[in-house]
Amino acid sequence: MNNYIDIENKDKSITKAFIMGMKHSKKYGYDFLVCIVKTKVVMYAIKKVNDNFYKYDINNLVVISNLNNEFQDENNKYLDTNILPKVLKHY
């Protein structure tokens, strides 16, 4: 199984991301996709449109962290957690 996906940036360049895991949230109706992008852990919220297509909205970036598990939100404010499973469990 190939755990890498391509993420299109705002400038249309492509970034390779390594998928660490995915968790579905019944509460929010999203699948949360956790990736490593370069030296950051990134969590995206995506919605399943059909079996072959997921809709990804760049505004749904939920968590950014560096690999030292220092979590930040998209406004670069540090969040009150320090390990990825806790973040996933929350959703």
Where are these regions (language model features)?
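Short, charged/polar N-terminal "headpieces" of proteins
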Residues: M1-F32
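Mixed-charge, Lys/Arg-enriched low-complexity segments
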Residues: Y54-Y91
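Acidic, low-complexity, intrinsically disordered interaction modules
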Residues: H24-Y28, V37-I58, V62
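Intrinsically disordered, low-complexity N-terminal regions enriched in serine/proline/glycine
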Residues: N3, A17, K27-G29, M43, ...
